[in-house]
Amino acid sequence: MEMDEDPDNLPAQGQGNIIITKYEQGHRAGAAVDLGHEQVDVRKYTNNLGIVHEMELPRVSALEVKQRRKESKRTNKWQKMLADWTKYRSTKKLSQRVCKVIPLAVRGRALSLLLDIDKIKSQNPGKYKVMKEKGKRSSRIIHCIQLDVSHTLQKHMMFIQRFGVKQQELCDILVAYSAYNPVSIPGQRYSWYLCPYSQAWVSLGGVATS
């Protein structure tokens, strides 16, 4: 069966198999859905949050420069705190800094420590892989997730490529979580997924392994 066939016109199990296969094969350079993005230097159109705009961005303003310097200082403070996590993990200072929003540059590491991901992963070896394979057998869930993934942060650098690496990871996370928590409804937007997949999986309430 050709992989370009419309999954909506196939039996349920066939739909699920084709969708999963497309994600496993990954992004195809020059695909119609994102050809426009590959023909330009997207760096000129991308802001500091990774969002790709329709028009080339103007030069950075004095206010933005000031904000970035402030963010850099906050990042340095977080790096020092993360380097001595045992000392700061239960302090008021940590709570205050979390409330001010964790800087993007250290957010992944901070979430990993806050959620105690390494401990949870070691206590549940293989759980994520088992749930992912189980979830792949549900065509209904896969089809719902596929619709959501294709609309998640379409203009963000991480998701701009159809069936790209980050779309693959997001699909895997949601497939696994749908198997782990069957009462969840995979019909919401998942724009929060901007951290490593194992952190996203644990933060959803599941358990992961690398």
UniProtKB/Swiss-Prot annotation:
Ranges of residues in domain Rab-GAP TBC: 101-210
N-terminal signal peptide: none
InterPro entries, A to Z: Rab-GAP-TBC_dom, Rab-GAP_TBC_sf, Rab_GAP_TBC_domain
Disulfide bonding pattern of the chain: none
Pfam families the UniProt entry points to: RabGAP-TBC
Protein name as it appears in the record: TBC1 domain family member 28
Organism of this sequence: Homo sapiens
Classification of source organism: Eukaryota, Metazoa, Chordata, Craniata, Vertebrata
Underlying gene: TBC1D28
